[in-house]
Amino acid sequence: MMTKVLGMAPVLGPRPPQEQVGPLMVKVEEKEEKGKYLPSLEMFRQRFRQFGYHDTPGPREALSQLRVLCCEWLRPEIHTKEQILELLVLEQFLTILPQELQAWVQEHCPESAEEAVTLLEDLERELDEPGHQVSTPPNEQKPVWEKISSSGTAKESPSSMQPQPLETCHKYESWGPLYIQESGEEQEFAQDPRKVRDCRLSTQHEESADEQKGSEAEGLKGDIISVIIANKPEASLERQCVNLENEKGTKPPLQEAGSKKGRESVPTKPTPGERRYICAECGKAFSNSSNLTKHRRTHTGEKPYVCTKCGKAFSHSSNLTLHYRTHLVDRPYDCKCGKAFGQSSDLLKHQRMHTEEAPYQCKDCGKAFSGKGSLIRHYRIHTGEKPYQCNECGKSFSQHAGLSSHQRLHTGEKPYKCKECGKAFNHSSNFNKHHRIHTGEKPYWCHHCGKTFCSKSNLSKHQRVHTGEGEAP
């Protein structure tokens, strides 16, 4: 969600205990080897969290230094209040997770607390599927972190679920989070990136001796994936293991319950860029479960991210963030008609109304549209496609917005409430029309005479006087 540094997504959660982190793990890019070292968001977070009072001559200096460190981490000059809040909530959420899950979630680099929850729910569903069930006393529900331990790693201590120290730096480069020692070494590496390169070079001679220990030192990621994959039914196992045949390292065979024979060893560390998560609807594959979850919303029409200001809903948190800026910041992109926008792309779409530019044309009737989405929705008129069906009465709709509005007839829900007078509405368009009564906004502009209107219907009535179809109101 925020910033990617050194080619890796920042890990916002707490760092595992120092003795479990292992040697310094830093991914070095070519430009860094030339002398350009870019500090990570995680490093700034740790500097802020681990700052000590004894490092300053007095309380005022300590407070001043804390403010500087906090700004370096949260970057309030570029991040919104909501982004900063989400960062803090995600950090605390990862802090309260059991150790068995904490580092596993960090491995997937969630962009928000909601995405971290989705990862855990996906993992829990994996473990609840047939073939993953572990015998438990009646009426006792085990949490997901206990299911992980009992479904394949019960013989291992909780500490074994944490990433194990490796003898070389490069083994974590493809998927490990960026951890920087908070000591004098940090300053040395920050001032001279060549030391990072020396660290990597000095360990290359030890690789041959470490290869036999690699399966035991793969750490948390290998343990979790082996538990999930090894316990799946055979049909699902074949699907999950696509493109894993070329993996070098394998985990020792796992013993099945009640069986003396161990299962065949399966690859545990996925190949970089491998797409193991497959959509059941269209077959599209993804490299992590969070991207699959986002993709599924294109089929379900789900929009879980709702703007608290106007009630508009979005399928992705990033789209909500962009939208929310329209409520918080100035709108620097002005149109000659006086309407302003927070993004240049919105201004371009709006200007097509003045120029009558409509680059997207329907092949059946020739009608043109300014946006591709409008053309897709229009085309369903010709095909008769109505993919959105109401579960209550079976009525179908060509657009998800139509289904959402219809479902409120069953529930009686009116989520759009006016803060000025308290009146509630079941549809955002009705709410927006009403809200213009209070603001006096008239966003619909006649390009013939320049007169403005508060609703599109009033503009259409007015334009008839120019086309000769009727008189203006």
From Swiss-Prot:
It comes from the Eukaryota. Residues 148-165 have a biased composition (Polar residues). GO terms for biological process: cell differentiation; male meiosis I; regulation of transcription by RNA polymerase II; spermatogenesis. It is found in: Nucleus. There is a cross-link at residues 27, 221, 232, 349 (Glycyl lysine isopeptide (Lys-Gly) (interchain with G-Cter in SUMO2)). SUPFAM superfamilies: beta-beta-alpha zinc fingers, Retrovirus capsid dimerization domain-like. Pfam families: SCAN, zf-C2H2, zf-H2C2_2. Residues 127-167, 244-272 are annotated as: Disordered. GO terms for molecular function: DNA-binding transcription activator activity, RNA polymerase II-specific; DNA-binding transcription factor activity, RNA polymerase II-specific; RNA polymerase II cis-regulatory region sequence-specific DNA binding; zinc ion binding. A zinc finger (C2H2-type) spans 277-299, 305-327, 333-354, 360-382, 388-410, 416-438, 444-466. The keyword DNA-binding applies. One of its GO terms (cellular component) is nucleus. Residues 45-127 form the SCAN box domain. PROSITE patterns: SCAN_BOX, ZINC_FINGER_C2H2_1, ZINC_FINGER_C2H2_2. PANTHER family: ZINC FINGER AND SCAN DOMAIN-CONTAINING (PTHR23226), ZINC FINGER PROTEIN ZFP2 (PTHR23226:SF366). This is Zinc finger and SCAN domain-containing protein 21. The lineage of its organism: Eukaryota, Metazoa, Chordata, Craniata, Vertebrata.
